[in-house]
Regions:
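Short hydrophobic/aromatic beta-strand or adjacent loop that forms the aromatic wall/cage
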Residues: 34-36, 144-151
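Active-site rim helix/loop that mediates acceptor-substrate recognition in acyltransferases
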Residues: 14-46, 50-68
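Conserved GNAT acetyl-CoA-binding A-motif
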Residues: 96, 101-115
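Conserved active-site alpha-helix within GNAT-family acetyltransferase domains
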Residues: 105, 116-142
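Glycine-rich phosphate-binding loop
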Residues: 90-91
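Conserved acyl-donor/pantetheine-binding loop and adjacent beta-alpha core of acyl/acetyltransferases
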Residues: 48-82, 87, 97, 134-146, ...
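A short beta-loop-alpha structural element at the N-terminal edge
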Residues: 1-7
């Protein structure tokens, strides 16, 4: 993923209150390129996804450099999925399926912060809300009122996986983590 200009333009449109500098995006891409994708539609780049190894029940700070990824990471953290409104209808779902396979190959859990009241969307994939402690609740506050920390335990979901969502008519790409 190299088109930082398009990524930043999409981020500014989708996440106007969750600003992150271009250098912060670039660092995440450099630290874990396997988790980063531009999402392409008929019109070109219509979205992006950023994910990287992290620790469960912890949230990487917004607009801050990570410097490195934790050696003892126990989850694949979905930092952001953003798709332009006119292009929603499947491209984000394909990215999440890619992350699912990546996490399964390493035995990791998937984690994210659901924003903009998208919790029910993430639940369709298999993510579940997690009870948070005071420290995590304080960090969630900077994401807005509807922010919810969620995990998808892929090992537990193996036997009871919900049906994969996202028919073209569904609004899956409204997922903005």
């Amino acid at each position: 993923m190299t088109d930082i200009t398009a990524i930043i333009a999409i981020a500014e449109r989708i996440h106007p209150d969750l600003f992150e500098r271009p250098d912060v995006f670039a660092e995440k891409m450099r630290l874990f390129p396997d988790g980063c994708r531009v999402l392409v539609g008929d019109e070109g780049i219509v979205g992006y996804g950023l994910a990287h190894p992290w620790k469960q029940h912890q949230i990487p700070p917004l607009d801050c450099f990570l410097a490195s990824l934790p050696d003892d990471a126990d989850c694949l953290y979905v930092h952001d999925v953003a798709v332009l409104p006119f292009a929603r209808g499947g491209v984000a779902a394909a990215y999440i399926r890619t992350l699912e396979q990546l996490a399964r190959s390493s035995g990791a859990v998937l984690a994210l912060v659901s924003v903009y009241a998208t919790r029910s969307l993430w639940e369709q994939f298999g993510f579940r809300s997690v009870t948070t402690n005071a420290e995590l609740r304080a960090k969630l506050a900077c994401y807005g009122e509807a922010a919810t920390y969620m995990l998808w335990d892929l090992a537990a979901a193996q036997s009871s996986r919900p049906p994969t969502p996202m028919t073209p008519s569904e609004s899956a790409d409204q997922a903005q983590t």
